[in-house]
Amino acid sequence: MVKNNKGKVCNMYQDEYKRWLAADLEDADLKPELAKIEGNDDEIKDRFAVALKFGTAGLRGVLGAGTNRMNIYVVRQATQGLANWVKTQGGSQTVAISYDSRLKSDIFAKTASRCAFMMR
């Protein structure tokens, strides 16, 4: 929860959850997951109150729907942020993207690859 400038608590994570719930999601697996947590404020808060952090080992988190979960939308956002940063460094626009045997690793690599290609 975040306090606004008048000290009132804002439940912005609920707004973000509703936005995802109403969206025409490309990853159809996430819709039933979102519907299942409807009304569960603790679960919605855990998934939507913060963004998944990009650390020294990259993105790591629980698979699922939300800004604090591993999914194609979070991968796209992180890829765009990284691509924007690389451009500011004046470096090469060549990147290497790979995947391993973890669940959905290949899908996330392809998502990142398409996103990076579009940033060229």
Regions found by a protein language model. Name each.
Residues 111-120:
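Short helix-loop-beta junction
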Residues 1-11:
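Short, Lys/Arg-enriched N-terminal segments with co-localized hydrophobic residues
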Residues 12, 17-112:
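An N-terminal, well-structured beta->alpha segment
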